[in-house]
């Protein structure tokens, strides 16, 4: 009997240790935007559709109103390429503090433990990576040592010109390229600014072709 009690105690201890080793990450709330909620200001019909996943965390500076408004304001910047956001889901996660910051090894763990559809934009409290960027895009070409983060964007609280920054980083992911442009007022200039919103036909064509090939954009019916 004593041996059985000892074995049972050991089993309980091992189980408890295993449970505590797996961080508690759970979705606590979600919001949805349909195509009808997102502005389409272009005069020509959209050719490609984009579905986005947006992630915020409890107990951070980010709120749903800010992130959803930035997503709506970003939509016209993609429209010039014939790309329409056909759906966007914002999920709020409850997670241990370390996951609320962008740090490559920890964020890789988060992506493994709580996978979401891609492309995905994570709104975090700050970045702990060095050098530090307000926002960082990880495509497939630059995710070789961090495959869990492919097709994701990480945005720190306080990022300026948020809708422009989101469109800029999303374009990096869709085009699967870190290239920047020297053209005046181009969205892909190295520094984002309110006036940097334009894209050329050739930029749009490259982005659409790559994103469609990678399954991030879908052709819309005529």
Would you name each region that the model predicts?
Residues 5-13:
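Bacterial N-terminal signal peptides
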Residues 15-17:
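Sec/Tat signal peptide C-region and signal peptidase I cleavage site
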Residues 109-115, 127-149:
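Catalytic zinc-binding patch centered on the HExxH motif and its immediate surroundings
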Residues 170-185:
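Catalytic Zn2+-binding segment of zinc metalloproteases
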């Amino acid at each position: 009997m004593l041996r059985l009690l000892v074995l049972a105690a050991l089993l309980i201890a091992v189980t408890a240790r295993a449970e505590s080793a797996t961080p508690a990450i759970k979705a606590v709330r979600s919001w949805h935007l349909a195509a009808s909620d997102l502005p389409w200001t272009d005069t020509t019909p959209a050719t490609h559709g984009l579905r986005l996943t947006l992630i915020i965390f409890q107990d951070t500076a980010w709120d749903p109103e800010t992130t959803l408004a930035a997503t709506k304001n970003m939509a016209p910047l993609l429209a010039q390429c014939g790309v329409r956001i056909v759906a966007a889901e914002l999920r709020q996660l409850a997670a241990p503090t370390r996951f609320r910051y962008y740090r490559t090894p920890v964020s890789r763990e988060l992506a493994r433990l709580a996978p979401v559809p891609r492309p995905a934009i994570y709104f975090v409290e700050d970045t702990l990576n060095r050098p530090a960027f307000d926002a960082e895009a990880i495509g497939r070409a630059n995710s070789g040592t961090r495959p869990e983060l492919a097709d994701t964007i990480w945005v720190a609280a306080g990022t300026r010109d948020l809708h422009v920054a989101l469109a800029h980083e999303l374009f990096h992911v869709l085009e699967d390229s870190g290239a920047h442009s020297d053209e005046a007022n181009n969205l892909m200039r190295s520094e984002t600014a309110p006036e940097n919103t334009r894209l050329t036909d050739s930029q749009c064509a490259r982005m659409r072709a790559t994103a469609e090939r990678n399954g991030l954009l879908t052709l819309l019916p005529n």
